[in-house]
Amino acid sequence: MDTLDELLPREKMLRSGIASLSDVELLALFLRTGTPGKDVMTLAKEILQHFGSLYGLLSADFAQFRGVNGIGLAKFAQLKGIAELARRYYSVRMNEESALLSPEMTREFLQSQLTCEEREIFLVIFLDAQHRVLQHSRLFSGTLNHVEVHPREIVREAIKLNASAVILAHNHPSGCAEPSKADKLITERVIKCCQFMDIRVLDHLIIGRGEYVSFAERGWI
């Protein structure tokens, strides 16, 4: 009987489930074919080694891809499609679920939306009194290391949606999720502004590269 290591990714998935696949095998499953003189498993391994991680791979631009021998526009488009499908899946799920099921679901959604962004994006999730999702919006965009946030605009949008609570989030393209002094100050400003309209700020999450910081989990909110 074949061992799992000897099975092709597709057969291994059918036998043991998608979670049994390594990063290399999962990438090979999506790529489907290799290049002349190179099978798909070898190609997948070389691609991951070149970019260092799945994050590095899925956030790379076409110019970076052209540095990998045998990779063209078709496979670049496939991989960008994977990242976009994941982002849209979580976006649709957030819109269709009747409520936020768990902090994990919220974090997964925010990571899918913000992890690969090359500049800072400030996103707000608006919730009703039962903490059902009303809307999520990218309200502000900035530079590589800064985003200008206007608390009154957050409150204005919350009032328009009749929201009772909000969850704040933004990314750090540098990869480090630790909040800066400016991050803490803007959180305090948003909280104070929301309090005037009886709107609760439930959390502020900072999304880094494979890591996150939750103000609520740290007891700051």
Curated annotation (Swiss-Prot):
InterPro entries membership:
MPN (IPR037518), RadC_JAB (IPR025657), RuvA_2-like (IPR010994), UPF0758 (IPR001405), UPF0758_CS (IPR020891), UPF0758_N (IPR046778), UPF0758_YicR (IPR022820)
Q: Does the keyword Transcription regulation apply?
A: no
- Give the UniProt record's GO annotations in the biological process aspect: proteolysis
What PROSITE patterns does the entry give?
MPN, UPF0758
Q: Which SUPFAM superfamilies match?
A: RuvA domain 2-like
Q: Which intervals hold domain MPN?
A: 99-221
Signal peptide feature range: none
The residues that hold Zn(2+) are: 170, 172, 183
Report the superkingdom from the record. Bacteria
List the keywords (alphabetical): Hydrolase, Metal-binding, Metalloprotease, Protease, Zinc
Which is an annotated Pfam family here? RadC
Segments carrying motif JAMM motif: 170-183
Molecular function via GO: metal ion binding; metallopeptidase activity
Q: What is the similarity comment for this entry?
A: Belongs to the UPF0758 family. YicR subfamily.
Protein name per the record: UPF0758 protein YicR
Gene from which the chain derives: yicR
